[in-house]
Amino acid sequence: MGLSDGEWQLVLNVWGKVEADLAGHGQDILIRLFKGHPETLEKFDKFKHLKTEADMKASEDLKKHGNTVLTALGAILKKKGHHEAELKPLAQSHATKHKIPIKYLEFISEAIIHVLHSRHPAEFGADAQGAMNKALELFRKDIAAKYKELGFHG
């Protein structure tokens, strides 16, 4: 399940593009998530009122949350699988406070892959997509293990 050095390099190369506009990428990813899986919006009290894509695009709060999500994910990706310290508080909050099912993390992973491919087709070809998919799978597997430790089976 681990990634090779080359795969991590592909992940981090495209992540450099993401970091140039974390909030914009994050907002696009959350919009894709909410449009593709409307049930996920129910987990976000402060976004439930956003019914249309136009509402979502106009929301500074959504943009801010997108920035928060991708900042945390970037810190995890940069650890190249050695992300125990970064993962623990994230798993804690997502399991006990937010109660985010692992399935929703699969949904946001799909949204990440889609948005990165649409925004960076040259840097995010099949190899980079495969590497990012593996990195996100590793993240989900490890967070699922933490969820289990916390007694959350979402």
Curated annotation (Swiss-Prot):
It catalyses: Fe(III)-heme b-[protein] + nitric oxide + H2O = Fe(II)-heme b-[protein] + nitrite + 2 H(+); H2O2 + AH2 = A + 2 H2O. The keyword Amino-acid biosynthesis does not apply. One of its GO terms (biological process) is removal of superoxide radicals. GO terms for cellular component: extracellular exosome; sarcoplasm. Nitrite binds at H65. Keywords: Cytoplasm, Heme, Iron, Metal-binding, Muscle protein, Oxidoreductase, Oxygen transport, Phosphoprotein, Transport. InterPro entries: Globin (IPR000971), Globin-like_sf (IPR009050), Myoglobin (IPR002335). Heme b binds at H94. The modification Phosphothreonine is found at T68. It comes from the Eukaryota. Residues 2-148 form the Globin domain. O2 binds at H65. It is found in: Cytoplasm, Sarcoplasm. The modification Phosphoserine is found at S4. PROSITE patterns: GLOBIN. Gene3D superfamilies: 6.10.140.2100, 6.10.140.2110. Monomeric. Monomeric heme protein which primary function is to store oxygen and facilitate its diffusion within muscle tissues. Reversibly binds oxygen through a pentacoordinated heme iron and enables its timely and efficient release as needed during periods of heightened demand. Depending on the oxidative conditions of tissues and cells, and in addition to its ability to bind oxygen, it also has a nitrite reductase activity whereby it regulates the production of bioactive nitric oxide. This is Myoglobin.
